[in-house]
Amino acid sequence: ISQKHIMLFTYIIGIIFGFPIGAKLTADFCSKGYIDKNHREILSALANHFSLPFIITYALSEQLNICSHYSIYLVSLLPSAIGMIAMLSINKNRSLKQKIPAQGFKLNMQIVDAGIMKGFETLIKLCGYIVLFSIVSRIPQTIAQKADCSMPLSADIIGAFFETTNGIGIVCGLCIPRTLSIVLCIALLSFGGVSCMVQTKSIFRDTGFRLYRYILLKAAMSILSCLLCIILFCILI
């Protein structure tokens, strides 16, 4: 199996099932030597994305109440798709140095138990970070209210970038033009939020994962998504 096919598999599964599957698969494949460790930050940034069902059902239908012009909102996936195509083109002739023959099916309950426990550990950690950063995302708003801040809107937007699920709800509840709400939601979906970054770092613990590269890539994709969203707004609306 070539490295290109493994990276493509990681990206597709990450897009379908959503965060943090992309980072988890990247970490597992890198630990086994199936993917070059130099690509882990890039592949994680590309594959570690919110799933299409989350974007369509929660962000678009439930929060933004949008039933048309889905192409505008799906631009949050476009930069990662472009980056993935470029990455596959660069690695198209590289393959795994070691090929492991497939073994016959054996039901090993120890492996099943270990898989279940590892899955629960990841799930509980994910839920814990979501709860923690959902609380943290409200702190800037609370501070602004207590201090009688003249710019409460800025505090709300800053808080929204801590945890995306809660942040989208915050943005959609602001008294701002609808176009600006949509652009901010696109930025949140592409960037992922501070919570996603901390969770990604925890998945790659003790591996030398360079978080700053991941953050820079996510920020670049967020900016590009916003620009594409504005361009599509001008064309379609």
Task: Locate predicted features.
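Transmembrane helix-loop junctions in multi-pass membrane proteins
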Residues: 57-67, 137-150, 169-177, 196-205, ...
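Selected transmembrane alpha-helices and immediately adjacent juxtamembrane segments
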Residues: 73-149
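Alpha-helical transmembrane segments of multi-pass membrane proteins
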Residues: 9, 117, 121, 125, ...
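Hydrophobic alpha-helical transmembrane segments
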Residues: 11-12, 43, 70-74, 127-128, ...
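Hydrophobic alpha-helical segments of integral membrane proteins
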Residues: 1, 8, 29, 104, ...
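Alpha-helical membrane segments and immediately flanking helix-loop junctions
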Residues: 2-64, 158-173, 182-205
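C-terminal transmembrane helix pair
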Residues: 36, 52-55, 77-81, 178-237
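Membrane-embedded alpha-helical core segments of multi-pass
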Residues: 20-22, 48-57, 78-86, 90, ...
